[in-house]
Amino acid sequence: GYDAAFHFTSHTFSPCGIRGNFGPTLAEQVTYYKRITPSIPWDQTSILDIGTLDGSVSAHGFQKFTIPKDGLYQIDAYGAIGGDGDYYIHSLPGKGARVRANFTLLRGDKIIMIVGHQGPPSHASNGASGGGGGTYVLKNQATTSPDDIYLIAGGGTGMAEYGAVWY
């Protein structure tokens, strides 16, 4: 059944190896999570979904998770690290923030996750890399109310250009 299929006590949601402006599709999520946690039948249940937020807002790249049973859930959200560079190692990208909180959730509740990606690298000898993406954990609502936000963790800064480290 539903509870038996999801007997894990912890799971890490990630960008599923996808980089760029868009998050993973549902097929990419299923493939990635089946490789990471093969004992879970990710493709045989409605636990993981993309679909839409309340049927109105397209959710491509969002990860929607259905809570398998009532309980207290600890959620850690990490912002992504900033991009690095190809030419110099005089500066390092910033690490993303980490935010942790506990929430009482009920079986069937849905949470939406937008998992930040590492910032793009600098491919120029005098350029800076991009900042890392933020990670958001939200209630399954198509509103902008602060009450619909569980956690937000900011992404890290990109690596400074070569000359910036000497000032």
What residue spans do the PLM features occupy?
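Extended, low-complexity, turn-rich repeat/linker tracts enriched in Gly/Pro/Ser/Thr and Asp/Glu
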Residues: 81-85, 119-122
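Secretome/extracellular-domain signature
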Residues: 93-167
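Extracellular beta-rich ligand/substrate-recognition surface
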Residues: 44-59, 88-95
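Short, solvent-exposed loop/turn elements at domain surfaces
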Residues: 20-24, 83-86, 160-163
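A short beta-strand element within beta-rich, extracytoplasmic domains
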Residues: 71-81
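Extracellular and analogous surface-interaction loops
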Residues: 5, 49, 54-57, 62-73, ...
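Boundary/junction segments of secreted and surface-exposed precursor proteins
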Residues: 2-36
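Aromatic- and Gly/Pro-rich amphipathic surface segment
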Residues: 35-47
